[in-house]
UniProtKB/Swiss-Prot annotation:
Active site: C85, H177, E179
Gene: guaA
Protein's recorded name: GMP synthase [glutamine-hydrolyzing]
Subunit structure: Homodimer.
Pfam family, one: GATase
Catalytic activity: XMP + L-glutamine + ATP + H2O = GMP + L-glutamate + AMP + diphosphate + 2 H(+)
Source organism (scientific name): Xanthomonas axonopodis pv. citri (strain 306)
Domain Glutamine amidotransferase type-1 stretches: 8-203
Gene Ontology CC terms, in alphabetical order: cytosol
Domain named GMPS ATP-PPase: residues: 204-396
Lineage top rank: taxon: Bacteria
EC number(s) on file: 6.3.5.2
This protein's UniProt keywords: ATP-binding, Glutamine amidotransferase, GMP biosynthesis, Ligase, Nucleotide-binding, Purine biosynthesis
Gene Ontology MF term list: ATP binding; GMP synthase activity
Length: 521
């Protein structure tokens, strides 16, 4: 079996918003990599066995006392080093060069002139012309003098050192961000460093990852049984498919139907996993319990806690019926691992993420199986397709853990949930028919607990309002509202009002994030 972790890259994170993007780009090349905080125990660098080290960008200034620095072990390792933005600045400052604060921050598109061909830049061109490249800048400081042994490889009209290298040491730096798509040749630069300079083989593929994880799971659990909380979301669905392939009927999935899922989602989950794939799934119809617990509750955080705690309670009840289960499978993904690792000094960037499931009871005493813990979300999706899950399931828009409970403003009632689920299904159906679903990052309907005057036939109606929300985003930290065609919105509105009894008005949310959040609650 191929060892997919043999060739790997270590990324030291100095707090950049793009650090995870660097890792994702390297994984896309086909090479495994890990992100460590810049102040991670440096004695572990040699033992990690990386083929090369990348120093990320960051918000600090190398011109100020106490700025984060790369451990000396990085330079003593003999490994290739690639500094990006702040990473290049600290590379210069630590190796005898100089940095200075710019008169004005540089953010956005820029063009760099390649003035010396090294292993990264040789023969590289794009639409900007020969020896001139389109890049993306985001910096306040810049390198004013390169260290001894370094050559300036690129400049701009505003800064003297846009890139530098010491070919003998295999140390490289760029002031711009190759991981961002606006840098047109960025992926080529990263590939040249990872594959050509570091000599990594491209072994990190979906097929190899599946083979590796199947072997790991079988070795970990042996003949024991495993339970999994199956939500119908991407992560738990991929875990279910992967574990079923690895251990067959030793996997039992518990699917809690809360009554707050997408339209007919419970039936779809059962059809896909229980009927089509042959996975052992216990379906718990818990809608009555959820609506009873949520009666009279209007505060969003209170609703979230009730929904989460009740899931844990029901999952605990079902797991107690499975006496032979020794392992709990979870859909933990790599951003969760990065967040929990944190930083010793608190200066390194801590990446926040939303967890699908809250803490499970300590008395369960089950071992953890986390086959996705090395993967980013886009990698999880690719695994899902490789495992045979439908693309429509794997590439669905995000859905909040509390489900429709936070898309019904105020008190949650069964009739509200049924109305909203149907309205949402109409919106999504029309997006797919118009080939707009994949151009939006997230789209959904919201139930507003207010009534509006309308006219149905010749009679006055006083009925509910449905809001539609669609956004475009790269990272979900910021988002633009999707500029859907007016004719399309009219079609959706007409269908909702005509097909759903009790709705007299449909509105479209044109708020960006910030100031609004993507979800309404």
């Amino acid at each position: 079996m191929t060892n997919i972790h043999t060739d790997k890259i270590l990324i030291l994170d100095f707090g950049a918003q793009y650090t995870q993007l660097i890792a994702r780009r390297i994984r896309e090349i086909g090479v495994y990599c890990e992100i460590w905080a810049w102040d991670h125990d440096p004695s572990e660098i040699a033992g990690f066995g990386a083929k090369g080290i990348i120093l990320s960008g960051g918000p600090e200034s190398t011109t100020l006392p106490g700025a984060p620095v790369a451990p000396q072990e990085v330079f003593d390792s003999g490994l290739p080093v690639f500094g990006i933005c702040y990473g290049m600045q600290t590379l210069a400052a630590q190796l005898g060069g100089a940095t200075e604060a710019a008169d004005q921050r540089e953010f956005g598109h820029a063009e760099v002139d390649v003035v010396a061909a090294d292993a990264l830049f040789a023969g590289l061109t794009d639409h900007a012309g020969a020896s001139r490249l389109n890049v993306w800048m985001s910096h306040g400081d810049h390198v004013s003098q390169v260290p001894p042994g370094f050559t300036i490889t690129a400049t701009t009209d505003r800064i003297p050192v846009a890139a530098m290298s010491n070919e003998a040491k295999r140390w490289y730096g760029v002031q711009f961000h190759p991981e961002v798509t606006h840098t047109l040749q960025g992926q080529t630069l990263l590939r040249r460093f990872v594959v050509d300079v570091c000599g990594c083989q491209t072994l990190w593929t979906a097929a190899n990852i599946i083979e590796d994880q199947i072997a790991r799971v079988r070795e970990q659990v042996g003949d024991d049984e495993v339970i999994l909380g199956l939500s119908g979301g991407v992560d738990s669905s991929v875990v279910a498919a992967l574990l079923h392939k690895a251990i067959g009927d030793k996997l039992t999935c518990v699917f809690v139907d809360t009554g707050l899922l997408r339209w007919q989602e419970g039936d779809q989950v059962m059809a896909m996993f229980a009927e089509h794939m042959g996975v052992k799934v216990i379906r718990v119809n818990a809608a009555d319990r959820y609506f009873a617990k949520l009666e009279g509750v209007r505060d969003p955080e209170a609703k979230r806690k009730i929904i989460g705690n009740l899931f844990v309670e029901i999952f605990d009840e079902e797991s107690n019926k499975l006496a032979n289960a020794k392992w709990l499978a979870q859909g933990t993904i790599y951003p969760d691992v990065i967040e929990s690792a944190g930083s010793k000094t608190g200066k390194a960037h801590v990446i926040k993420s939303h967890h699908n499931v809250g803490g499970l009871p300590e008395h369960m005493k089950l071992g953890l199986v986390e086959p996705l813990r090395e993967l980013f979300k886009d990698e999880v999706r690719r695994l899902g397709v490789e495992l045979g899950l439908p693309r429509t399931m794997v590439y669905r828009h995000p859905f909040p853990g509390p489900g429709l409970g936070v898309r019904i403003l105020g008190e949650v009632k069964r009739e509200y949930a049924e109305l909203l689920a149907k309205a949402d299904a109409i919106f999504i159906d029309e997006l797919r028919k118009a080939d707009l679903y994949d151009t939006t990052s997230q789209a959904f309907a919201v139930f507003l607990p207010v009534k509006s005057v309308g006219v149905v036939g010749d009679a006055r109606a006083y009925e509910w309002v449905i809001a539609l929300r669609a956004v475009e985003t790269i990272d979900f930290m910021t988002a633009h509202w999707a500029h859907l065609p007016y004719d399309f919105l009219g079609t959706v509105s007409n269908r909702i009002i005509n097909e759903l009894r009790g709705v007299s008005r449909v509105v479209y949310d044109i708020s960006g994030k910030p100031p609004a959040t993507i979800e309404w609650e």
